[in-house]
Amino acid sequence: MKQLLSLLIALTFSSISYAQDNRVPSKGLALFSKDGNFEPYEFSRHAIGDNDILIDILYSGICHSDIHAGRSEWGNTSYPFVGGHEIAGRVAQTGKNVTKFKVGDYAGIGCIINSCGQCDNCKQGLEQFCEKGMVGTYGSHDHFHDNEITQGGYANNYVVSENHAIKIPQNADMKRVAPLLCAG
């Protein structure tokens, strides 16, 4: 746990510039095997789309689901694995069609980061049953972005559709908000 906290603190103070039209560089903590320890990991997230927001992560909770997935106890974990689906942070950039957020707003992310938004289930707010397949925060094939494997919130940033982010009041204590996002 001390190792994880030390690495998270180091990531918080590292500087990354954001690409406008390209993939977003990210730094996180990853497991490279089910028996490994967290290690620093540099990767990239998909480019910020017209309906996406880029969140600078302030806090990410640790859920037992992260432990199960990281140890591949549910099977088929892809490594390197960056866990974390209880994400609270500040909006750093918005796509041109974003209406729910502005730069500087607090935002949260739960366990689902994308769905088609068009099928009957999505229209009823049941994105977890998206007929085209929902995209999870980590370890999920993102079929909306070249089928890349999603990486979670044990990182410095996250790109997410505005429809799958939650606006957090500016007076919220963000370290207490992150664990509330466990259920998405």
What does each model-found stretch correspond to?
Residues 1-4:
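Positively charged n-region of N-terminal signal peptides that target proteins for export
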Residues 17-19:
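Boundary at the C-terminal end of the N-terminal hydrophobic targeting segment
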Residues 22-29:
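Short structural boundary motif marking the start of a folded domain
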Residues 30-37:
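Extracellular beta-rich ligand/substrate-recognition surface
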Residues 46-60, 73-123, 128, 151, ...:
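Glycine-rich beta-strand-centered segment in the early N-terminal region that forms part
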Residues 116-184:
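NAD(P)H dinucleotide-binding glycine-rich loop of Rossmann-like/cofactor-binding domains
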Residues 65-71:
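Cytochrome P450 core scaffold surrounding the K-helix E-X-X-R motif
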Residues 6-15:
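Bacterial N-terminal signal peptides
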